[in-house]
């Protein structure tokens, strides 16, 4: 279904700031009657007569009782130069649950409707202010875990990904139009050969662009969702100390008693621009303790699901069978092997370790003395962003929906090429080319289903 701007919208209202105590809260209105409704409850200048994009001092009052609720500043922004392209009012009131909710309820009782999650952004999309990739980047920006992920989200919000996708769609549309002309009005005997050549070249060209975009998907997913990182090792080798160092706070219990971490602890941390979802696992060993055994089993699952494994070994002890089992169990994963406790007399046989672990995976540290941890952080950044240090200026694919649609478009282009290779008539190959055009259009929202909008914007917070 193509994008259509609805002819009528009611006026919506919501609190746009997080709930709780704070210096200031913002209550937002959007719609044809936004100014009229706000004016009913505002004591100060007549908001229906003030210039657009002005901030106006006054009080919110209950029109029925004339009771003052709060001293406020009201921003008046008239269509179309607003986020939603509707008239927008933003009431800056004192923070706190009670005054903010009282103002919201007053607006609702005077003609506004409580906005659904993401409805302001949805209206911006439906009015053509932004496309779907830009709408999704709004939430990415809110949820950004590092400076780098924030810059990538801003890049997408600026429309850089949209521009690239639309250029690819235009390339497809141009060749489809030319193919149609050649089929309907052939002027040369070899028109079929020329048309086939044209279709093939464009399918290859667009497919190559899609493949280049998909090469950024892995790093993009890391920036958007965080890198699932399991910290593993046998009990009491320093896993929890490492977690606490990376977090810069004590989240895990650190003692000299083996087996004190009996569950899986998850935390997000920014390491040199890489958002890590750190998982501190219970030490893996044979145990009779029922609770600890459950933690050990969860640890094994965490290793399977992790994008990166940090395997911690104790450099002050000899390599044990449990260490060797963990080295073997994690050998197929992207891995950093950390030789910890180097501040103590070393008993670890390095020749034995190097036989089992490649040299470039090894890092020596003393988390207690804070030595070697900088090299660990450098290693993490090098592993995942060595080739894209300037990722903030790169068009990246960070969204699973976009990745799926790009893969579908690539499959459609493969079908075009396979059809041409097998001698299929050009007009039938056009169908798959058109499918690729549609699938790319779903990324930007140039074509969409209503169910998609409902599902997508329901993930937003109220007031956005």
UniProtKB/Swiss-Prot annotation:
TrmE-type G domain residues are 226-385
Cofactor(s) the record lists = K(+)
- Judged by the first EC level, this protein's enzyme class is hydrolase
Q: Which GO terms describe its cellular component?
A: cytosol
Q: Which parts of the sequence bind GTP?
A: 236-241, 255-261, 280-283
Q: Which UniProt keywords apply?
A: Cytoplasm, GTP-binding, Hydrolase, Magnesium, Metal-binding, Nucleotide-binding, Potassium, tRNA processing
This chain is encoded by the gene named: mnmE
Please list the coiled coil stretches. Answer: none
Q: What is this protein called?
A: tRNA modification GTPase MnmE
Compartment(s) of residence:
Cytoplasm
The protein's matches in NCBIfam families, at most eight in alphabetical order, are given as: mnmE_trmE_thdF (TIGR00450), PRK05291.1-3 (NF003661), small_GTP (TIGR00231)
Q: Which HAMAP family match?
A: GTPase_MnmE
The record describes the protein's role as:
Exhibits a very high intrinsic GTPase hydrolysis rate. Involved in the addition of a carboxymethylaminomethyl (cmnm) group at the wobble position (U34) of certain tRNAs, forming tRNA-cmnm(5)s(2)U34.
Alphabetical list of Gene3D superfamilies matching this protein = P-loop containing nucleotide triphosphate hydrolases, Probable tRNA modification gtpase trme, domain 1, tRNA modification GTPase MnmE domain 2
Q: Name one GO molecular function term.
A: metal ion binding
Which parts of the sequence bind Mg(2+)? 240, 261
Give the matching Pfam families. MMR_HSR1 (PF01926), MnmE_helical (PF12631), TrmE_N (PF10396)
Q: Which GO terms describe its biological process?
A: tRNA methylation; tRNA wobble uridine modification
Instruction: Please report the organism this UniProt entry assigns to the protein.
Output: Ligilactobacillus salivarius (strain UCC118)
Instruction: Name the lineage.
Output: Bacteria, Bacillati, Bacillota, Bacilli, Lactobacillales
Sequence similarity: Belongs to the TRAFAC class TrmE-Era-EngA-EngB-Septin-like GTPase superfamily. TrmE GTPase family.
Q: Binding residues for K(+), per the UniProt record?
A: 236, 255, 257, 260
Query: How is the co-factor bound, per the entry?
Result: Binds 1 potassium ion per subunit.
Q: How does it assemble?
A: Homodimer. Heterotetramer of two MnmE and two MnmG subunits.
What residues bind (6S)-5-formyl-5,6,7,8-tetrahydrofolate, as annotated? Answer: 28, 90, 129, 464
Listed PANTHER family: TRNA MODIFICATION GTPASE GTPBP3 (PTHR42714), TRNA MODIFICATION GTPASE GTPBP3, MITOCHONDRIAL (PTHR42714:SF2)
Under the heading InterPro entries, the entry gives: G_TrmE (IPR031168), GTP-bd (IPR006073), GTP-bd_TrmE_N (IPR018948), GTPase_MnmE (IPR004520), MnmE_dom2 (IPR027368), MnmE_helical (IPR025867), P-loop_NTPase (IPR027417), Small_GTP-bd (IPR005225)
Q: What is its EC number?
A: 3.6.-.-
